[in-house]
Regions:
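Histidine/acidic-residue-rich, glycine-tolerant segments that coordinate divalent metal ions
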Residues: 68, 90-92, 101-111, 117-118, ...
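Acidic/His- and Gly-rich active-site-bordering loop/insert found
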Residues: 3-112, 117-141
C-alpha cells in the first residue's frame, strides 16, 4: 500500500469512528455502569459478544475455560490482526460519570479507576473500522477482537497465552486511556501472583 492509499484508509477509518462515536460512547457508559470485577464481567462480556454477533463477527465465548473471555473473528486470510479489549473494574471505586469529586453510584461499590470501560469500547471501535475497510476493499485480512477479562489481577492473558490463542496472529494491538497520546514500544515483565504461607517458629 502506497502512502496515498494508506492516508486514505486512515482517514476513512477515522471518519467511520467519528460518524459512529455515539455508539461507542454508549458502550463505554454501559460498561462504566456495570463496573464488574475481574473474571466476573458477565454483563460486559455479554454486551460485547452481542454487538460483535450483530455485526457479522464469528464469536467464540468461554475460551480457555474463562467464562468472560471471548474472541470475535471477521474476514479471512492474512494478515491476522488481533485487537485486545479489557473491561474489568476495581472494588471501592464506584463513581458517577462526569463528577470531579467523590460521588459513588453505590457506596463502597465497584468502579472503573483505570478506564477499562473506554479501553474495551475503543478497541471495539478500531475492530469495527477495520471490518469496514475489509468489506469495502475486499482485501485479504482477518481482524480478531479479544475479550481479555481480569486484567487487574493479571489473569486471563496468561491463560490465553498458555492455550496458544495468540499463535495465529501476525500482530496484536491494544491501547490504554491516559493523559497523553503516545506509542509504547518497549517490553515489560510477565506478572505472576504467588501466595506464600510460612509455618513454624520465627
Amino acid at each position: 500500500m502506497d502512502d496515498t492509499a494508506m492516508k486514505k484508509a486512515k482517514t476513512e477509518a477515522a471518519d467511520y469512528i467519528e460518524a459512529n462515536q455515539e455508539i461507542f460512547v454508549d458502550i463505554s457508559h454501559q460498561i462504566w455502569q456495570y463496573a464488574e470485577l475481574s473474571l466476573k464481567e458477565y454483563r460486559s462480556a455479554e454486551l460485547y459478544c452481542k454487538i460483535l454477533k450483530e455485526n457479522g463477527f464469528d464469536v467464540k465465548e468461554n475460551i480457555c475455560g474463562i467464562a468472560t473471555a471471548f474472541t470475535g473473528h471477521y474476514g479471512s486470510g492474512k494478515p491476522v490482526i488481533g485487537i485486545l479489549a479489557e473491561f474489568d473494574a476495581l472494588s471501592g471505586l464506584s463513581q458517577q460519570g462526569g463528577a470531579t469529586e467523590a460521588k459513588p453510584i453505590v457506596a463502597g461499590g465497584n468502579g472503573h479507576g483505570c478506564g477499562h470501560n473506554m479501553l474495551g469500547a475503543g478497541s471495539l471501535a478500531a475492530a469495527m473500522a477495520v471490518k469496514q475497510y475489509l468489506e469495502q476493499t475486499k482485501k485479504s485480512g482477518t481482524i480478531v477482537f479479544f475479550g481479555c477479562p481480569g486484567e487487574e489481577g493479571g489473569a486471563s492473558k496468561a491463560f490465553m497465552a498458555r492455550e496458544g490463542v495468540w499463535r495465529s496472529l501476525d500482530a496484536a494491538l491494544t491501547w490504554h486511556p491516559g493523559d497523553t497520546n503516545e506509542i509504547v514500544s518497549g517490553t515489560c515483565n510477565s506478572c505472576i501472583q504467588v501466595l506464600y504461607r510460612f509455618h513454624g517458629v520465627a
